[in-house]
Amino acid sequence: SQLLEDVYAYNDYSYSGRGPGCEPRSAVTPDLRKGYLISEFGGQQFPAKAFDDEPHRLAQALHHAAVLNDAIAQQGVAGALGWCMADYNTHREFGSGDRICYHGVTDLFRNPKLSAAVYASQKTPRSPSDVVFEVSSSMALGDHPGGFAGACWVFTNAESVRLYRGNDFIAEFTPDRRGRFAALPHPPIEIQDFVGSLLEKYEGLDQSTAPQVAAILNEMRRDALNLSPLSRARMLSLRLGANDLLRMYYKYIGVLGGPSSVYRFEAVWHGRTVRTVVKEPVQSVRLECVVHNPILTDGPTWDCAAVSLRAIDQNGNLLPYCGEAVQLSVEGPVKILGPAIVPLRGGMAGTYLATTGEAGRAVLHCRMEGALDVEAALTVRKRSGAENAN
């Protein structure tokens, strides 16, 4: 490649999940006096479908976070543009065999995947409504190999995250300003402790022993079959038997098929809780319908509104494995652009509503098996002749 204009733009697809997130500028551009922009990254290096399993969706989010972090940390890089905002239709030689490229941080209907929260959370909040708070894990053990829960990250611009198990406070977590994502304005927060002081409270362990046992249990949560030498040494020094350890593991971490726990995550901003996310087994399913532009103006051409559909649980959490079909119908001066029956993919779908030349009130009706029917109202205005002339 060569420098043709004032800014050297380079598509950097070098990151594969390990090592630096981007190449050194000095190894790429022939002229360090000129501006330098990473014009693309990510994309085919780590596509993720909205209906992929939890570890894969998380890995895509961390992939974007790593490249953004290292681009910010490197002096002389004007910016880095992730490829890309939304999944897109493509030709038969590309994509995932269905002529769709799943390179986006949103799906085809602009519904956000987990990786979209990486970008959204980099804005510094000015009010509680600006706080982004996305927990990567459903806390469902069955979504992971062997029933080991794996990693849990929170993508947020809050100051800290508090975790509760039932009514018990576990721990408060803050961004790691020296870790892998330290250069980001708001690094994602890894939740590493799911035991806290519960062993002191319920097992009677002293303040020296309890943290060591908790560390073993938290490591077992990620992979109980491959304990580190440090954890094995702790077991020996504490004379902790396998039966006692397993009993506490079942009680404080949980196993596949055992009693489930309710986890509450709280976003703390300016010393108070401004957002709450509750993770527990699904008890009910609700269809959510959001019209992004509920006031349309017809004339001199037609206007259009995008509609997002999501299947959510009783706590408002997305259900990424819900693939039910949603039946759509309308009343009033709008028409559906696209099919009247749309399947949820990754628990999400969408449609578009266009004006038909008339003014008035319009209603979109949505019906899905297993959930209550929902509807959304729109107002269609007619542009006046004088406005049309202008």
Regions found by a protein language model. Name each.
Residues 152-156, 303-320, 363-366:
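Beta-strand-rich structural segments
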Residues 84, 89, 94-288, 317-319:
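Catalytic cores of secreted or luminal carbohydrate-active enzymes
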Residues 103, 168-172, 321-333, 339, ...:
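Short, well-ordered beta-strand segments
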Residues 141-147, 295-305:
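Short, solvent-exposed loop/linker segments at the N-terminal edge
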Residues 180-191, 331-348:
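Low-complexity "stalk/linker" and mucin-like segments enriched in Ser/Thr/Pro/Ala/Gly
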Residues 258-262, 302-304, 358-361:
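Extracellular Ig-like/FN3 beta-sandwich strand-entry sites
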Residues 1-115, 122, 128-145, 176:
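Substrate-binding/catalytic cleft of secreted carbohydrate-active enzymes
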